[in-house]
Design a protein with these regions (language model features):
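Conserved alpha/beta cores of soluble small-molecule-handling proteins
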Residues: 2-183, 187-188, 216, 221, ...
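Glycine- and Gly-Pro-enriched alpha-helical subdomains that act as flexible
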Residues: 183, 190-212, 217
Length: 264
């Protein structure tokens, strides 16, 4: 109950202004609402710090450049806004931040960026979200869905865009089948990723994850790979099949922290 009260009373940062949750809105003409034209980052807060913030902001700016979206401010200014928002909400731990940037407000509901009449809309939503301590005991159940991750020349899955229909289709299929998460394949039938988390397996002492061609190169994903390399643990970004998943010793994903997967 206390957690719900705290969530309902948060202040949300919209373009630098702190607004109570129940009053926080964006225009119906906003590019993100009309078209899903925007980018985002998911950030964790530990002991008052935002781990790997520089990498998150670098990826955000790279996504903006790919979309020809002018951020309209510096990384230092946006970083200051993030910490201002945390301070205003008295948040220091067990917090997840959704940082969203859209192209801005349009004069009419049309996809051409030329009809955008404002600067970008930048929203910071901080929420208390502690990892579920029971997840590793029971594990998450995966369902292999028929929706595939797509080619980069259709919609590059390595851009963290607001256009998430591909993952939403996978999520719906898994949920309707009674499972927790979707395991998604690439166009060639190799394992790509899950609908909302990355996917690793361990086989014969080796850590495997997908090639990365059909998924976001997540910050935590890259950190896991780097930690394995630093500790002489064999780790491979490679193509592998469902058959190899079924024969794995361990399945794991990263959803608010490391989570073991119980069934695939």
């Amino acid at each position: 109950m206390l957690r719900l009260v705290r969530l309902l009373s948060i202040l949300i940062n919209i373009n630098g202004e702190l607004i109570p949750r129940e009053q926080a809105t964006v225009s119906v003409f906003d590019s993100g609402f009309i078209l899903g034209d925007g980018i985002w980052e998911g950030l964790r807060v530990h002991d008052g710090a935002i781990p790997f913030l520089d990498r998150h902001l670098k990826r955000l700016w790279e996504g903006a450049k790919a979309l020809d979206l002018d951020m309209g401010l510096s990384q230092e200014t946006l970083s200051a806004r993030l910490f201002q928002t945390l301070k205003a909400n008295q948040m220091t731990d067990h917090v997840h931040i959704r940082l969203m940037v859209t192209r801005g407000i349009k004069s009419t509901p049309y996809q051409d960026p030329a009809v955008t009449i404002s600067g970008p809309t930048i929203v910071i939503i901080p929420e208390f979200k502690a990892p579920d301590p029971t997840l590793n005991d029971r594990g998450l159940r995966l369902y292999t869905v028929y929706t595939r991750r797509g080619y980069a020349d259709v919609q590059d899955p390595r851009i963290n865009s607001h256009s998430k229909l591909n993952c939403i289709f996978g999520c719906i299929q898994a949920a309707k089948a009674g499972y927790d998460e979707a395991l998604m394949l690439d166009p060639h039938g190799h394992v790509a990723t899950c609908n909302s988390t990355h996917f690793f397996i361990v086989r014969d002492g080796e850590v495997w994850t997908s090639s990365g061609d059909y998924c976001l190169d997540g910050i935590t994903r890259r950190n896991v790979i780097n930690v394995c390399k630093a500790n002489d643990i064999p780790v491979f970004e490679k193509n592998f099949s469902l058959m190899q998943v079924y024969g794995a010793d361990i399945l794991s994903g990263w959803l608010l922290g490391s989570v073991l997967l119980s069934q695939s």
